[in-house]
């Protein structure tokens, strides 16, 4: 099978707040909010800080799909190159990867990025809001001790995952059943996470139609909200001192087919 990729474009303000409004598949980038449900922070770029709130599902602006369409993808293909696209003074800068330029900066806050999926129970995602125990993790990439040490020592800018890293490849599990799914991307910024409610979560949900899956996976499902506790050690952590030597992202381990 020929590998194909989806790029989740991240737009960031100088404040390091950001949104995930578009994806790219087979080299073609969608318009903002074309296949991603518009989020509450589409103008403010602000985070979710209450993990018990309904915003944890898809951080959606309004009920319904806000006119978002479906993107057809193949199970086993790569959802690849999670890349950075910065917004400056509200205008898209020329270093956006989905404009064909490489990102020349990195997000300033360390923390894990998680990808989850949820299958629309009725077969159609149009009226699906992502509520209930329907979610499973397909990937997580988190900061290492060296990332935290770099941040602690100099308070300098560090990447989400590791210094210099601006891309992330994620595979749609081959063992999924065919159908319509949410792909939920979530970055957890930990720079202020030393107390409950300090972690900042940036969330979006794209709508995918998956085909070519084997249908053999029977996942253990979770809900958003519900999967995370405000006191989860993956959400309440002082990354500066003492520097964490081990960090585990909330939500458990990702799916392995």
Where are the regions a protein language model picked out?
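A glycine-anchored, Pro-Gly-centered beta-turn/N-cap motif
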Residues: 172, 177-179
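A short tyrosine-centered beta-strand micro-motif
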Residues: 181-185
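Short acidic/polar micro-motifs centered on Gly/Asp/Asn
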Residues: 171-172, 189
């Amino acid at each position: 099978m020929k590998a194909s990729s989806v790029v989740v474009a991240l737009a960031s303000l100088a404040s390091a707040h950001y949104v995930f409004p578009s994806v790219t598949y087979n080299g073609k980038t969608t318009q903002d909010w074309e296949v991603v449900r518009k989020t509450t922070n589409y103008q403010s770029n602000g985070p979710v800080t209450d993990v018990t709130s309904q915003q944890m599902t898809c951080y959606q602006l309004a009920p319904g799909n806000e006119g978002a369409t479906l993107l057809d993808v193949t199970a086993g293909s790569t959802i690849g190159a999670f890349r950075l696209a910065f917004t400056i003074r509200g205008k898209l800068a020329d270093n956006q990867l989905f404009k064909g330029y490489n990102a020349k900066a990195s997000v300033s806050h360390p923390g894990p990025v998680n990808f989850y999926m949820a299958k629309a129970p009725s077969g159609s995602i149009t009226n699906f809001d992502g509520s209930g125990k329907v979610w499973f993790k397909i990937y997580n990439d988190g900061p290492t001790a060296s990332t935290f040490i770099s941040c602690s020592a100099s308070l300098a800018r560090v990447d989400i995952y590791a210094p210099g890293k601006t891309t992330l490849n994620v595979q749609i599990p081959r063992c999924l059943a065919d159908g319509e799914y949410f792909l939920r991307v979530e970055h957890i910024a930990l720079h202020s996470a030393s107390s409950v409610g300090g972690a900042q979560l940036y969330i979006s949900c794209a709508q995918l139609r998956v085909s070519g899956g084997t249908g053999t996976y029977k996942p253990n499902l979770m809900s958003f909200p519900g999967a995370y506790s405000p006191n989860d050690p993956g959400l309440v952590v002082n990354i500066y001192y003492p520097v964490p030597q081990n960090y585990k992202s909330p939500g458990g381990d990702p799916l392995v087919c």
